[in-house]
Amino acid sequence: MVTIYYTAALVLSVIFFMILWSMGHNQNIPSLLMAFTCVIINNGACLALSLAKNVDEALLANRFVYLAGVFLPLFLLTTICQLLRVRLSDRKLLVMTLINFAVLFMTYTPGYTDWYYKSVSIDTSDGFTRLVKEYGPLHNVYIILLFLYVAAMIVIIAAALFRQQRCSYKYASVMLIS
């Protein structure tokens, strides 16, 4: 059942990406396309994880899940900034990208060190594979990264609404609610 869910999610994400791509000739929001690409990678990696036969395959799939998970918030933040006409400086983008790569490096250490996961095994008892992991000392860094991105998105949306910038209030309101 889980494999069917992940397959359906992957197929739908590819369809939505193709729809966005075909509409993209009139839009200039490359970060939204990158966000959709991250969703496709995540869904494909979750499907691969559910089908993994051993720990090495599961860890490889998990690395792709984190590849998408680390960069999706960055692309969503830049999409929000583009839609609301908020300029992110090149320096801020560089710093955020470097931080993302550092966190990505940490998420790739399972199987080599115990920084991110102290121990990893797989469980296939329910007809699909899932990782059974004991979190290491650096696992909270990823959660903090996600929290900071969500907080930044909320602040940018709220600031755009309250400063009455030249942006679509429909976009800002919908983004703030969601």
What are these regions (language model features)?
Residues 14, 85, 90, 151-154, ...:
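Inter-domain helical "communication" segments and dimerization helices
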